[in-house]
Amino acid sequence: MSSLCASNCYPSSSSINLFSNNNNPTKPFLLSLRFASSNSLPFVAPLKFSTTNHVLSNSRFSSNRIQRRLFLLRCVSEESQPSLSIGNGGSEERVNVLVIGGGGREHALCHALKRSPSCDSVLCAPGNAGISSSGDATCVPDLDISDSLAVISFCQKWNVGLVVVGPEVPLVAGLANDLVKAGILTFGPSSQAAALEGSKNFMKNLCHKYNIPTAKYKTFSDASAAKEYIQEQGAPIVIKADGLAAGKGVTVAMELEEAFEAVDSMLVKGVFGSAGCQVVVEEFLEGEEASFFALVDGENAIPLESAQDHKRVGDGDTGPNTGGMGAYSPAPVLTKELQDFVMESIIHPTVKGMAEEGCKFVGVLFAGLMIEKKSGLPKLIEFNVRFGDPECQVLMMRLESDLAKVLLAACKGELSGVSLDWSKDSAMVVVMASNGYPGSYEKGSIIKNLEEAERVAPGVKVFHAGTGLDSEGNVVATGGRVLGVTAKGKDLEEARERAYSAVQQINWPGGFFRHDIGWRALRQKQVATKEE
């Protein structure tokens, strides 16, 4: 069989014209150093706020003055942060880190990187209101992350030693390709390797070629042929758009008519554009879903802790799918034996297969799994090429290792022998979303009492996703999923109690949340207790 990467529909960044040719580096906004009330660490905050476009802007500070502030930030950080070990890999260097993205996942990454002894300072583009105001990073909202030349220029100007790309879209577009070509260490796969998420057909073909356990499937570009196959297979059945569809490209059809409608919407009506020019028709798997993450350096992979999210919008796993309404870690369904099985049967063959196909994978490999009811073993549902959101929030709350150091090791191909340290505590995140999500929703509703929520108990952190500031400085909702109220506890029950206590403190009539995050794990524990 020929190389899968050679036939990949996502070309290398040198052959696509997704970025502008603007060679002018984007200037960071005006900075001010102050101390957060919750701890002794300083953070860089905006001095000027534009009421016309809801972004922080720059007007008059010189590069030298900004550099002096970053230097002061580094000095205080050196005195206040403990040293953490990641194992045998990595180096002792300290770097400025740029996180690409502006959601809850990126806020969690910034929060973890801020604690890293190997990190001098954390920048986030574009970031959001919560990332900036919490002091977890310096936000650079004016940096156009779709313009690779602007990002490269910014990194060179501010001596950025590591770029961490959060969302999948810039990865599929080839941002990592261009940064690596410019000599900038980048944690995130090339556009070719990102096809593991960017093309369902590519991923399924790789699984078939390298014997990776997944659901039976067939790919179609003709609606009539797809419907004929669906008629033969029967319902329930799964219909997936081949490309990126903002999390809306999967239909789990319980009836044949629903499956036919999904095929027509993608192949005939073109609701997902080019992302739906092919559909993958997949066997329905019955069981329990779980999320598995591994850090990959091109040849080696090390597992992260397990997590489980909640896709459906309503309590009891009802309603349409979302980007995720909550998560917890660890996930009891992924036992040590099953985690070993996933590494040996799914992760390692994928990493090896990608290398053999000529597109080595560097970044985080997120395997969406189904623990099959009939066999008790995991099958791969999908690959994502970035941290999950909201799973990243609970993982970063439990991580005790130096995140910057291990990501640098991954970028340099030095993960062999590296191990990570994790808190024995459990963590849970409850997502608060705008009323109407995942359908249409209004923006601009005011959110209050966020600081009170973080003070309700130890180990509580509110991660921001779709937030901004209005003209009076109030935090307002700007997206569908808006907040990730996260808490640690000695066990899942305590983490859940703290998270929901914090949620109750938040005054936001324009939002809603699920009331049953963690129900599967808690039910399993109750059953186990009764059996004892």
Curated annotation (Swiss-Prot):
Coiled coil: none annotated. Pathway: Purine metabolism; IMP biosynthesis via de novo pathway; N(1)-(5-phospho-D-ribosyl)glycinamide from 5-phospho-alpha-D-ribose 1-diphosphate: step 2/2. GO terms for molecular function: ATP binding; metal ion binding; phosphoribosylamine-glycine ligase activity. Keywords: ATP-binding, Chloroplast, Ligase, Nucleotide-binding, Plastid, Purine biosynthesis, Transit peptide. Pfam families: GARS_A, GARS_C, GARS_N. It catalyses: 5-phospho-beta-D-ribosylamine + glycine + ATP = N(1)-(5-phospho-beta-D-ribosyl)glycinamide + ADP + phosphate + H(+). GO terms for biological process: 'de novo' IMP biosynthetic process; purine nucleobase biosynthetic process. Signal peptide: none annotated. Its main location: plastid. InterPro entries: ATP-grasp, ATP_grasp_subdomain_1, PreATP-grasp_dom_sf, PRibGlycinamid_synth_ATP-grasp, PRibGlycinamide_synth, PRibGlycinamide_synth_C-dom, PRibGlycinamide_synth_C_sf, PRibGlycinamide_synth_CS. It comes from the Eukaryota. Belongs to the GARS family. This is Phosphoribosylamine--glycine ligase, chloroplastic. It comes from Arabidopsis thaliana.
